């Protein structure tokens, strides 16, 4: 009976035999989420959401709380790992045409927006210089909304400037949103298993399926262990690798940092925002930088689902990756030549991918038909 039970469990989730390592990032994201919620809970126990005490409470966690430095650094490094995994996860989806499973793709994009909001609120909590000024700049973008902008901004701040009520509500939101992420992740996984996962060839894998366990479960375990090794290596040798030096100073509303910038994982969107010399235009471009992903399922024109056998689409895809990295780099630099023009050019190239993709699909279809 026990053998039959094991076989039953193994066959509950038949998976295509040819899915590659790029399909392991979903489980790695789940691992990151569990780690963030666990470390976040222990940090919340010792954190004080008050503008006079927040910075001191983070210092207290680092210095006085047993293993507090591990919790704090793991939480900070874990956030970066989370975004590295999610960007690879999205890139894999774009390359292999996984967006054709519309419900999964749209729920995933909603998850990304929720995750970015959560990370933004979390970045404000230490109440360092960069935390304060990044919050001031980003929340101030709401004033670009016609008619309602100023009212919404004042309501979000809880006053006429970023102050104690702002920090309190940002802490509340940072605490509650991960549970929304759990719910959305559950929906994402349920929708995925409704049709089943795709594979690198983009073909129907019903005729060639293997049990998830032990084959893919061991592969997942290997990648998760690799993730932990990388995280603990950074934690041990360079715990402040992803931190901004400016954030080691307490927030001072009277002194503006020379160069205001968010965490590295928001720099691509911030670079697009900064490349447009108009407040409303920049805000719309910032929103579009993420929401444009939602257009992918509706603009797919190629007869082939993945880019595996589409050389023109592959060139466009790798140009997008190079563009993403370049925008991230330029956004970390001051607003001066040559970074302004590079940022503007790469921003155009970023959006051009989503416009060119359907046109390249049509072109490739024509080439195939002629041959």
From Swiss-Prot:
Membrane-traversing stretches: 25-45, 69-90, 105-125, 170-190, 218-238, 280-300, 312-332, 339-358
GO molecular function term, any single one: metal ion binding
Pfam families per the UniProt record, alphabetical: Cytochrom_B_C (PF00032), Cytochrome_B (PF00033)
Main location: mitochondrion
Binding site for heme b b562: 75, 174
GO cellular component labels: mitochondrial inner membrane; respiratory chain complex III
Membrane-related topology note: Multi-pass membrane protein
Cellular location(s): Mitochondrion inner membrane
Note: Heme 1 (or BL or b562) is low-potential and absorbs at about 562 nm, and heme 2 (or BH or b566) is high-potential and absorbs at about 566 nm.
Protein name as it appears in the record: Cytochrome b
Provenance organism: Sinomicrurus kelloggi
Organismal lineage: Eukaryota, Metazoa, Chordata, Craniata, Vertebrata
């Amino acid at each position: 009976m026990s053998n039959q039970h094991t076989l039953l469990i193994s066959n509950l989730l038949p998976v295509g035999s040819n899915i590659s390592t790029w399909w392991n990032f979903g489980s790695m994201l789940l691992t990151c989420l569990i780690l963030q919620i666990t470390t976040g809970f222990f940090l919340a126990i010792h954190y004080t959401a008050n503008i006079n005490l927040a910075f001191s409470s983070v210092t207290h966690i680092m210095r006085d709380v047993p293993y507090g430095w591990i919790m704090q650094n793991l939480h900070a490094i874990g956030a970066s790992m989370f975004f590295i995994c999610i960007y690879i996860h999205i890139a894999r989806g774009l390359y292999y045409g996984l967006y054709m499973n519309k419900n999964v793709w749209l729920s995933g994009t909603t998850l990304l927006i929720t995750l970015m909001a959560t990370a933004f609120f979390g970045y404000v909590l230490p109440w360092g210089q960069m935390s304060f000024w990044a919050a001031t700049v980003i929340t101030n973008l709401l004033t670009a909304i016609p008619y309602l902008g100023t009212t919404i901004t004042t309501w979000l701040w809880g006053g006429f400037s970023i102050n104690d009520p702002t920090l309190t509500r940002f802490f509340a939101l940072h605490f509650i949103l991960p549970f929304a992420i759990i719910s959305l992740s559950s929906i994402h996984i349920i929708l995925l298993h409704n049709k089943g996962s795709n594979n690198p060839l983009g073909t129907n894998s019903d005729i060639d399926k293997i049990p998830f366990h032990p084959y893919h479960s061991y592969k997942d375990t290997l990648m998760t262990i690799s993730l932990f090794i990388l995280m603990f290596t950074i934690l041990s040798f360079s715990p402040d690798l992803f931190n901004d030096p400016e954030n080691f100073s307490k927030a001072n509303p009277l002194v503006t940092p020379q160069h205001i910038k968010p965490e590295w994982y928001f720099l691509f969107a911030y670079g697009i925002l900064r490349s447009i010399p108009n407040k409303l235009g920049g805000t719309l471009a910032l929103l579009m930088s993420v929401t444009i992903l939602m257009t992918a399922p509706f603009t797919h024109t190629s007869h082939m689902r993945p880019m595996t056998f589409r050389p023109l689409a592959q060139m466009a895809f790798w140009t997008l990756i190079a563009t993403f990295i370049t925008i991230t780099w330029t956004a970390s630099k001051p607003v001066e030549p040559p970074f302004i023009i590079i940022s503007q050019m790469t921003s155009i190239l970023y959006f051009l991918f989503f416009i060119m993709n359907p046109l390249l699909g049509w072109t490739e279809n024509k080439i195939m038909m002629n041959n």
